[in-house]
């Protein structure tokens, strides 16, 4: 049975950098307040690029990093996003065209908000294990700035734009060791954006639900697999808020040195945060072969997921 392997990583961040000090000029906030409550220092904002363009540039970066690989080998394209620039066609369809892949391959979007990348990875794993595909371009891309109310200091300080891409291929070892994707729909109104509207969030409910659901889900993952916290090499959470990341890390008892944090640089990029973080780690040479990675994410819906992956 084939295993799901990560072949290469790529990312793209827009040119405009918005600092906490810039936000002090827009709303009643301060660098000290934002940093203390979120851990965020900067975020990137797309002024000219739409989500498809962000996805395209991240994909090119990813494909360029893949050794001895031709994009003609891509069997499918999946884009995780909740900020598509068109209702139709899907961003993945447009990305396929931008990449010049004229063959009739599978391409579609996944919208599970901030959990989107893990939901999409679950789909990719099922397709590779079943033998349906051999190579998939998996992208998380978001233009969160397009659904933000820039007069709402409770939300505008949290989000950023960007895209991350992972080239996933069939291999003989490693891969997904465990995954659990779910949705607690009773919290569906806690975080939402109406069509044509801006994002609304009950921050307290989201914070408490994230801590509770993910701590329990991670505990179940470790119990089911028999993998101890000490055996994990990295803990990569959706980069929403440093307090959530650190508190869950503390609750599961993982060494702080294994917790990967990029929210300070990029803010909350929704479905793009995990692949951007992977690309960041790869560019710094910090992912070793055979490493066990614990992924966890939560997002609107209220979706959440946990994946244990051997690199």
Swiss-Prot record:
Catalytic reactions on record: malonyl-[ACP] + acetyl-CoA + H(+) = 3-oxobutanoyl-[ACP] + CO2 + CoA
Gene Ontology cellular component terms for the protein in this record: cytoplasm
GO biological process: fatty acid biosynthetic process; secondary metabolite biosynthetic process
InterPro entries linked to this entry: ACP_syn_III_C, ACP_syn_III_N, FabH, Thiolase-like
Catalytic machinery residues: 114, 238, 268
Keywords attached to this entry: Acyltransferase, Cytoplasm, Fatty acid biosynthesis, Fatty acid metabolism, Lipid biosynthesis, Lipid metabolism, Multifunctional enzyme, Transferase
Compartment annotation: Cytoplasm
EC number: 2.3.1.180
Class of this enzyme: transferase
Gene Ontology molecular function: any one: beta-ketoacyl-acyl-carrier-protein synthase III activity
Start and end residues of each stretch annotated as ACP-binding: 239-243
Alphabetized Pfam families for the sequence: ACP_syn_III, ACP_syn_III_C
Metabolic or biological pathway, per its Swiss-Prot or TrEMBL entry: Lipid metabolism; fatty acid biosynthesis
CDD domains linked: KAS_III (cd00830)
Coiled-coil residue windows: none
Family: Belongs to the thiolase-like superfamily. FabH family.
PANTHER family per record: 3-OXOACYL-[ACYL-CARRIER-PROTEIN] SYNTHASE 3 (PTHR34069), BETA-KETOACYL-[ACYL-CARRIER-PROTEIN] SYNTHASE III (PTHR34069:SF2)
Quaternary state and interactors: Homodimer.
Function noted in UniProt: Catalyzes the condensation reaction of fatty acid synthesis by the addition to an acyl acceptor of two carbons from malonyl-ACP. Catalyzes the first condensation reaction which initiates fatty acid synthesis and may therefore play a role in governing the total rate of fatty acid production. Possesses both acetoacetyl-ACP synthase and acetyl transacylase activities. Its substrate specificity determines the biosynthesis of branched-chain and/or straight-chain of fatty acids.
Written domain comment of the UniProt record: The last Arg residue of the ACP-binding site is essential for the weak association between ACP/AcpP and FabH.
Protein name per UniProt: Beta-ketoacyl-[acyl-carrier-protein] synthase III
Recorded name of the encoding gene: fabH
């Amino acid at each position: 049975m084939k295993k799901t392997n990560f072949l290469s990583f790529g990312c793209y961040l827009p040119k405009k950098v918005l600092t906490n000090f810039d936000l002090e000029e827009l709303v009643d906030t301060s660098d000290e307040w934002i940093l203390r409550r979120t851990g965020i220092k900067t975020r990137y904002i797309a002024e000219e690029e739409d989500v498809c363009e962000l996805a395209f540039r991240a994909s090119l970066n990813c494909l360029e990093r893949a050794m001895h690989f031709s994009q003609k080998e891509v069997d499918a394209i999946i884009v995780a996003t909740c900020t598509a620039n068109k209702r139709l066609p899907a961003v993945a369809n447009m990305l396929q065209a931008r990449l010049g892949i004229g063959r009739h391959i599978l391409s579609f979007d996944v919208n599970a908000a901030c959990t989107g990348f893990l939901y999409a990875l679950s789909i990719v794993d099922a397709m590779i294990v079943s033998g349906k595909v051999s190579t998939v371009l998996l992208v998380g891309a978001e233009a969160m700035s397009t659904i933000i109310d820039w007069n709402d200091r409770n939300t505008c300080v949290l989000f950023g734009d960007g895209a991350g891409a992972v080239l996933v291929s069939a291999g003989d070892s490693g891969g997904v060791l465990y995954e659990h994707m779910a949705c607690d729909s009773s919290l569906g109104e806690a975080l939402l954006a109406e069509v044509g509207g801006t994002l609304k969030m009950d921050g307290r409910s989201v914070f408490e639900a994230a801590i509770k659901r993910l701590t329990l889900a991670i505990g179940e993952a470790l119990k089911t697999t028999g993998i101890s916290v000490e055996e994990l090499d990295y803990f990569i959470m959706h980069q929403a808020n440093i307090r959530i990341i650190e508190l869950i890390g503390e609750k599961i008892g993982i060494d702080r040195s294994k917790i990967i944090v990029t929210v300070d640089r990029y803010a909350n990029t929704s479905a793009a945060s995990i692949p951007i973080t992977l690309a960041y780690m790869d560019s710094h040479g910090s992912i070793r072969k055979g490493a066990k990675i614990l992924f966890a994410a939560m997002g609107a819906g209220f979706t959440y997921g946990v994946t244990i992956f051997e690199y």
